[in-house]
Amino acid sequence: MSVRLFNTYSRQTEDFTPLDPAGQRVKMYTCGPTVYNHAHIGNFRAYTFEDLLQRHLEARGYEVERVMNLTDVDDKTIRGARAAGRRLADFTQVYKDAFFTDLDTLRIKRADHFPAATEPRYIERMIAMIGQLLEQGIAYQAEDRSVYFRLAKFPAYGALAHLNLDELRPSGRVNSDEYEKENIGDFALWKAWNEADGEVRWEAPWGAGRPGWHIECSAMATALLGPELDIHCGGVDNIFPHHEAEIAQSECCTGKKFVRHWLHCAHLMVEGQKMSKSAGNFYTLRDLLEKGFTGREVRYALLTVNYRLPLNFTIAGLEGARAALGRIDEWVGRISDFRFQISDLGGALPANLSERHEGFFSALDDDLNISGAMGQLFDLIRESNSALDHGQLTPAQTAELLKLWESINRVLAFERESIVVPAEVAALVEKRQQARADKDWTASDRLRDEIAVHGWIVKDTKDGPKLSPK
């Protein structure tokens, strides 16, 4: 089965086919944070979904090149810097650093590129794109000295959000970065400098100012990935106006279809309500860590529901994530220890266990059906535990089972922080198991003490030796 993904543009689930003639390389752009504050868990729902998508595509043999932008100049960042009495670059750097720390805590893979909008090469590209649109008559400079995109020049505007422009009757201009579709109008490509911007300004042929939010992403995406992308992701709140504007300005500049597959993550609620500071249910990752939860527990909770469905994020859900991860940890520990048993028996894994592994990936092939995938994983855990209880698995088979788990975990990134058993300690454990099989208790005790010298404790259980650091 090929990977199938729901395309917001067509509103259909489609076979994923990359632009690469060899069918291997995938160009993926994901809208990153606006670094005016700490990212909240609603943001991280989108970022964990995008991480799951990348990991699954890679598990299926694709080579993903991903770009995630950092919006470090816009209305919000400028207001924040001004309120804090700091230079824009100093103000945003704090939140850039915090964002990368949060990514690592949630085990989200780093993108190949993290372009920041204020980097000179991207500012230059934004100015060049705006200049091209002006030359084509698609953009114009208004009396407020700002440059706007003329919606009438792009009849396909609204197709992504499935808007009927005849009903909305767009008129006038919109200078703010974010607005509702009822206020639709020509959007700003370049905002003329005013006193509120302070030192935030760049020189352009049409006057000093700064780029609008939408042109930033078009410039960075096409600079790093070219004029055509395989996948563009974001939250549903990005569909309009941001992604709609990206399509218009990018395709007018390049003459090519900007994105083949658009994927959008649904909203996150907290305890059944819209997240807000006034309701007391606004969480950053740091807030949850202070409550005693771990990054992987938050990651699990964020991935429990398919990305296209609203997620009700709750403290009870986090506690459920902790319990589920505990069950996974116990199982992984059991099969990890059982492989140290002494046995000459080998054999392939029972078919039902291999089928569960295949079922996990097949579920994710179906538009990242995470519920189906997790169902397959927990069936694998239940059935393999039962087989171990009844003596139906050999150490060699559990070693193969562990490999299946490792391939699953490369996608989920759920495993407990790894405690790597040094090779010399593992060798001592195997020697001790052989000594016990030979009933050489003196050698067994000596090897146990030698293992302890290396900083490890070995306990004998019905499933074999269990190792833990001292």
Question: PLM features: residue spans?
Answer:
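Structural preference for alpha-helix termini/caps and helix-kink/transition segments
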Residues: 281-470
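Short, solvent-exposed turn/loop segments enriched in Gly/Ser/Thr/Pro and often Arg
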Residues: 67-74, 117-120, 237
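Alpha-helical recognition segments enriched in aromatics with Gly/Pro capping
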Residues: 1-36, 47, 51, 124-336
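Short, well-structured beta-strand/strand-turn elements
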Residues: 63-65, 137-143, 457-459
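N-terminal, positively charged nucleic-acid-binding surface of large information/translation enzymes
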Residues: 10-13, 18-109, 467
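N-terminal, positively charged, Ser/Thr/Ala/Gly-biased leader segments
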Residues: 104-114, 120-137
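The substrate-binding groove and active-site-proximal loops of carbohydrate-active enzymes
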Residues: 81-88, 114-119, 235
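Alpha-helix C-terminal capping/helix-coil junction sites
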Residues: 58, 104, 134-135, 263, ...
